[in-house]
From Swiss-Prot:
UniProt record, GO biological process: lysyl-tRNA aminoacylation
Binding site for substrate: 76-78, 118, 251
Protein name as it appears in the record: Elongation factor P--(R)-beta-lysine ligase
EC number assigned by the record: 6.3.2.-
Chain residues that bind ATP: 100-102, 109, 244-245, 300
PROSITE patterns recorded: AA_TRNA_LIGASE_II (PS50862)
Enzyme class: ligase
GO terms assigned for molecular function: acid-ammonia (or amide) ligase activity; ATP binding; lysine-tRNA ligase activity; tRNA binding
UniProt-listed HAMAP family: EF_P_modif_A
Length: 325
C-alpha cells in the first residue's frame, strides 16, 4: 500500500475479520457469566479531572442552548457505568469508543475501543482473577504473574517506593540516565511514574501477563485505600509484552472522599497551568445514593487484539487510524 493511498484501511481485511471474531469471543465470555452489556453516552457535560488525561471538547447548540453547551468526549465510560451500578443494574460491561486528545503512535490512537466492566461484591483480587481468565482465553497465554508495586520497585530498582524520599528517587533516576528530567521534578508521584515507566515496565510481562497491584495511595484515582496498609490503594494494572493492557480498582464509594480527590486534581491542574475541569456532580450524587461495593477494570481492546494477532502496531488492527479518518 502506498503512503498516499489514505482512503484505504490501515488494517488488512484478514486482520479485521480476526478482530471481529475476538469481539464476539469477548461478548460470549461475559454472556456465559451473566454480565449485562450496556451502552452509555460518548459525550458528557463533565469530564475527568486527572492531570494526565486530556479530553476532546465540543459544543452543542440547539433548543434551549442558543449560547451553546460545552460537552466532552468520554475518556472512559466509568462515570456513567457507576451511575448504572448505583441504580441497581448488577454486573455490567461495555465495549465502546473512548477518546483522549493525546499522542498517536505505535500503541496509541486518540479514538480507541475500551472494554470496561464492573463486578458488585468482588474485591480487587477476585476481579484480577477474572481479567486473567479473559486474557488466557483471548491470547492463549499462560496464567499471569502477580506482584505488588512495592515488589517490582524492589526487584528492578532496589528501592522501596512507599518510603523513599525524592532524593532517593532522583538517585534511582540517575542510574537510568534520567537526571535531566528528574532533577527538576518536584512532584513525588511524577518521579515514581518516571521510574516505573523506564525502570520497571521494560522488565515485566515478557513471557506472561503481569499484574501490578497496590499502587501508592497518592495514585489512588477512583480506588479505595487499603484498610490493611494505608500507604497503598486497591488499584492494579496489567502489562504484557511491553504493553499496558488494563487498569482496575476496588471502587471508591465515599462521595465526600471522591469530591475531595476531584478538587485536589483541579488544584494540581491550576498549579501546572492546566485548565480546571467540570466535576461530574451526577457521579457524586450516585455515590451518595449508594454505590454497591464493587471492583471495576478498563482494558484497551485495540492493544488486546494487537497482541492476539502478533501485530506490530495498533494501525494493523484498526480500520482507520486518526491520520486516515
Amino acid at each position: 500500500m502506498s503512503e498516499t493511498a489514505t482512503w484505504q484501511p490501515s488494517a488488512s481485511i484478514p486482520n479485521l475479520l480476526k478482530r471481529a471474531a475476538i469481539m464476539t469471543e469477548i461478548r460470549r465470555f461475559f454472556a456465559d457469566r451473566g454480565v449485562l452489556e450496556v451502552e452509555t453516552p460518548c459525550m458528557s457535560q463533565a469530564t475527568v479531572t486527572d492531570i494526565h488525561l486530556v479530553p476532546f471538547e465540543t459544543r452543542f447548540v440547539g433548543p434551549g442552548h442558543s449560547q451553546g453547551m460545552n460537552l466532552y468526549m468520554m475518556t472512559s465510560p466509568e462515570y456513567h457505568m457507576k451511575r448504572l451500578l448505583a441504580a441497581g443494574c448488577g454486573p455490567v460491561y461495555q465495549l465502546c469508543r473512548s477518546f483522549r486528545n493525546e499522542e498517536m503512535g505505535r500503541h496509541h490512537n486518540p479514538e480507541f475501543t475500551m472494554l470496561e466492566w464492573y463486578r458488585p461484591h468482588y474485591d480487587m483480587y477476585r476481579l484480577m482473577n477474572e481479567v486473567d481468565d479473559l486474557l488466557q482465553q483471548v491470547l492463549d497465554c499462560a496464567g499471569a504473574e502477580t506482584l505488588s508495586y512495592q515488589q517490582v520497585f524492589q526487584r528492578h530498582l532496589e528501592i522501596d517506593p512507599l518510603s523513599a524520599d525524592k532524593t532517593q528517587l532522583r538517585e534511582a533516576a540517575a542510574k537510568l540516565d534520567l537526571s535531566n528530567v528528574a532533577d527538576t521534578e518536584e512532584d513525588r508521584d511524577t518521579l515514581l511514574q518516571l521510574l516505573f515507566a523506564f525502570g520497571v515496565e521494560p522488565h515485566i510481562g515478557k513471557d506472561r501477563p503481569t499484574f501490578v497491584y497496590h499502587f501508592p495511595a497518592s495514585q489512588a484515582s477512583l480506588a479505595q485505600i487499603s484498610t490493611e496498609d494505608h500507604r497503598v490503594a486497591e488499584r492494579f494494572e496489567v502489562y504484557y509484552k511491553g504493553i499496558e493492557l488494563a487498569n482496575g480498582f476496588h471502587e471508591l464509594t465515599d462521595a465526600r472522599e471522591q469530591q475531595q480527590r476531584f478538587d485536589q486534581d483541579n488544584r494540581k491542574r491550576a498549579a501546572r497551568g492546566l485548565p480546571q475541569q467540570p466535576i461530574d456532580t451526577n457521579l457524586l450524587e450516585a455515590l451518595k445514593a449508594g454505590l454497591p461495593d464493587s471492583s471495576g477494570v478498563a482494558l484497551g481492546v485495540d492493544r488486546l487484539v494487537m497482541l492476539a494477532l502478533g501485530a506490530e502496531q495498533l494501525a494493523d488492527v484498526i480500520a482507520f487510524t486518526v491520520d486516515r479518518a
